[in-house]
Every structure is written in structure tokens, then in C-alpha cells.
């Protein structure tokens, strides 16, 4: 299936149903009074994370989602039926952004997580709500309010513990094939990897971590060159980045300059991403003698001003890979994910029906009713409107 990590959709919640103007009419009951019911609330639009999905391709074709409108109220104090909700299922890791305001509405990071993206309109009030000791035959009602309407941008961001960085042909895909069951394409030409891929590294029966491989970066990626800048967002949730450096590039390029390009492009894209823990990993050491590889790796690290530990591995032969994976596993265990307070979903605000009803009644009371009479006749405009509605 084609990997699609962005999609734009339109969500429209249902409008609230209108209230009803009606009076009780029964034999031997000359003054039945008002019995118009309230309308129904409009349906909501929800997002739900589903671990069985891994792409947003469905929303390249289906772009509009509308919830059901609430039914109007009816006589005999019958309340209109509430509109049906609409649930949109998205892959785990999807970020929901309101394109109108640029606001991030939420991150869908857990299976089954739900997010309200469009609230249905509130119901209108029937004329029963407006009866009082001085107005026994009210002919007022209120209409339902419109539902929310939003244009949303869905961004799929892979959930991984470890992210792979490097130039094209640095050996990232070979590494992920060596440590996991993932089988990304491997070949001797640049940009073999065209879309991100995930692999689960199992150290034992209880310990494992997820590693993400993205297309290689090249100089000018932040300005749109190559493929990598488009997929750098998939590394934002990673806890540690493995910066793979080809210790002896076959094209004769300078490994130091290649590493500096990666660092520069990271900083241009996001300072937060550039500040993440980054480990230096020299790959393809099997192409050199052990002493030569160690000497060259030391020289590159010094040229980069690297003072932390670095690793020498061969993803193709497996040399040094196991030790690197265990160190990564230890780092992940010692640095658990800290739940960001801002990332928590906002609490659902309950609508205060009493306040809503009081506001509607106050608005009606403010209207001019000097020519009001309690006797209904055919000349009343409200009565004519009511007859046509029935």
C-alpha cells in the first residue's frame, strides 16, 4: 500500500434541530397550553486512533465528513432526535491541525484514543420553554445553532524510540535489516529508501525498541532538495538519533563534510530536533583494517569536535551491532518518556444547559411585545407560519 503521511479533510458537525411552536388541542380541554418540544442536538465529528492503519491514503480520496443534523422538535413536547456522530479512524501517531488557525488540536498517540474535532450545534427551544404566568400562549421558539466546520490537516508521524540519520547510502536500511525483521530495499545507488520504515529490535523476551529509517539527507534539504526534509518530522518523537557515517564513502566524499551537512540541515529544520540526543555511529568498518578504521574514526570525531562516545560497526557483517543495540536499550530504559503536560488532551467542557436556556429566554423577553395579545386568530403571523410548518 502506498505510504501517505499528509492529508487535508473537511469536517462539518450537524446543526441543532429547531424548536417547535405547538399547542395542545383536545376535546373538552379548551386551554391546553403550549406543547412544542425542543429540537435535537447536532451530531459531533470524532477522530479515533487505530493501530491497524498505517497510512492516510484513504483521505486522499474521501475528503469531506458531515455529521447528521438534529431533528426538529414536535408537538406533545416531543424532543427531536439527536444527530448521529461521525467517527474518522486514523493511524496511531497522527497529528490533527486546524488549518484555519494553525492550532494543533491533538496528537493521536494511543490505540483507541478519541478526539473531538467538530462539535454539533445546540438544540433550539420549543414554545413550552417560554410559558409564564403572564404569557400563557407563547408563540416563540429558537432555532438550533450551526455545528462546527473546520478544514483539518492530518500529519502522520511515526512512533519510534530510535531514529536513523545519515546521507544517502550511509547504510541505514542495511542496519535496520540487520537488527529487525523489517526488510527495506537496499541497493548501491542514492535514495534507495523512498518512504520511512519501522523495525522492532527485540533484545530478549521482555526488552525491545522501535527504530525508524527515513530517506537520506543531502545538502539543501531544508530548502526542499532531496527527499529527507519531508520525512524529518517522523523523528520528532524519537528519544535518540543514530547518526550513521560512511567511514569510507565509495564516491570519495569527505565524511566530515557529510556529517556537518546532516547537522546543519537538522538545525535549519528544527532546533528541538537538533537538540535531541544524537549518537555518532561509523558504519562499513569491514571495508578497512581494524587499526585504520579506528584511526580514521578518531580523526573524524576530532574534526567534528565530538567528545562523547562513538561506535564503529558494520551493518552488513553485524560487527559491533549487538553492543550498539544494547547500549540503546539501556539508554531507553534509563530515560523513560516524560508525559508533557501540554500534550495531554484538554478536559471536555460540559455545556451548561441552564445558562443556555436562561440566555435564550432573556433574549425573547427583550423583544418588543407591546401589541401582544393572548387571543390567537388567523391574522397572527406566527400562527400562519405554524400552519405552514405543520
Swiss-Prot record:
GO terms for biological process: ribosome biogenesis. It is an enzyme of class 3 (hydrolase). Residues 127-147 are annotated as: Disordered. Its EC number is 3.6.5.-. Its main location: cytoplasm. Mg(2+) binds at residues 173, 193. Residues 129-145 have a biased composition (Polar residues). One of its GO terms (cellular component) is cytoplasm. Residues 1-159 form the Obg domain. Residues 160-333 form the OBG-type G domain. GTP binds at residues 166-173, 191-195, 213-216, 283-286, 314-316. Its cofactor is Mg(2+). The keyword DNA damage does not apply. It comes from the Bacteria. Belongs to the TRAFAC class OBG-HflX-like GTPase superfamily. OBG GTPase family. Monomer. An essential GTPase which binds GTP, GDP and possibly (p)ppGpp with moderate affinity, with high nucleotide exchange rates and a fairly low GTP hydrolysis rate. Plays a role in control of the cell cycle, stress response, ribosome biogenesis and in those bacteria that undergo differentiation, in morphogenesis control. This is GTPase Obg. It comes from Shigella dysenteriae serotype 1 (strain Sd197).
Amino acid at each position: 500500500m502506498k505510504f501517505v503521511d499528509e492529508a487535508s479533510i473537511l469536517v462539518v458537525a450537524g446543526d441543532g434541530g429547531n424548536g417547535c411552536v405547538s399547542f395542545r388541542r383536545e376535546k373538552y380541554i379548551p386551554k391546553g397550553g403550549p406543547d412544542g418540544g425542543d429540537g435535537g442536538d447536532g451530531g459531533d465529528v470524532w477522530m479515533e486512533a487505530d493501530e491497524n492503519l498505517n497510512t492516510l491514503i484513504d483521505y486522499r480520496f474521501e475528503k469531506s465528513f458531515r455529521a447528521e443534523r438534529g431533528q426538529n422538535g414536535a408537538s406533545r413536547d416531543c424532543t427531536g432526535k439527536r444527530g448521529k456522530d461521525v467517527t474518522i479512524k486514523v493511524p496511531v501517531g497522527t497529528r490533527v491541525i486546524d488549518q484555519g488557525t494553525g492550532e494543533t488540536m491533538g496528537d493521536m498517540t494511543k490505540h483507541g484514543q478519541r478526539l473531538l474535532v467538530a462539535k454539533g450545534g445546540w438544540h433550539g427551544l420549543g414554545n413550552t420553554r417560554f410559558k409564564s404566568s403572564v404569557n400563557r400562549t407563547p408563540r416563540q421558539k429558537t432555532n438550533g445553532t450551526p455545528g462546527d466546520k473546520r478544514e483539518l490537516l492530518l500529519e502522520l508521524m511515526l512512533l519510534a524510540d530510535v531514529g536513523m540519520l545519515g546521507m544517502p547510502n550511509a547504510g541505514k536500511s542495511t542496519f535496520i535489516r540487520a537488527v529487525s525483521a523489517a526488510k527495506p530495499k537496499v541497493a548501491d545507488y542514492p535514495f534507495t529508501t523512498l518512504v520511512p520504515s519501522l523495525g522492532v529490535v527485540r533484545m530478549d523476551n521482555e526488552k525491545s525498541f522501535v527504530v525508524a529509517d527515513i530517506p537520506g539527507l543531502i545538502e539543501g534539504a531544508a530548502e526542499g532538495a532531496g527527499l529527507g526534509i519531508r520525512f524529518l518530522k517522523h523523528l520528532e518523537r524519537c528519544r535518540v538519533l543514530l547518526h550513521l557515517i560512511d567511514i569510507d564513502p565509495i564516491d570519495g566524499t569527505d565524511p566530515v563534510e557529510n556529517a556537518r551537512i546532516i547537522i546543519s540541515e537538522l538545525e535549519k529544520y528544527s532546533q528541538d530536533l537538533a537538540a535531541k540526543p544524537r549518537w555518532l555511529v561509523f558504519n562499513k568498518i569491514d571495508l578497512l583494517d581494524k587499526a585504520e578504521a579506528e584511526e580514521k574514526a578518531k580523526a573524524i570525531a576530532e574534526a567534528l569536535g565530538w567528545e562523547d562516545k562513538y561506535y564503529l560497526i558494520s551493518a552488513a557483517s553485524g560487527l559491533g551491532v549487538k553492543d550498539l543495540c544494547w547500549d540503546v536499550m539501556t539508554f531507553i530504559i534509563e530515560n523513560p518518556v516524560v508525559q508533557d503536560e501540554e500534550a495531554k488532551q484538554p478536559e471536555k467542557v460540559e455545556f451548561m444547559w441552564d445558562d443556555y436556556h436562561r440566555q435564550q429566554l432573556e433574549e425573547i423577553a427583550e423583544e418588543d411585545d407591546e401589541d401582544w395579545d393572548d387571543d390567537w386568530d388567523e391574522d397572527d403571523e406566527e400562527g400562519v407560519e405554524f400552519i405552514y410548518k405543520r
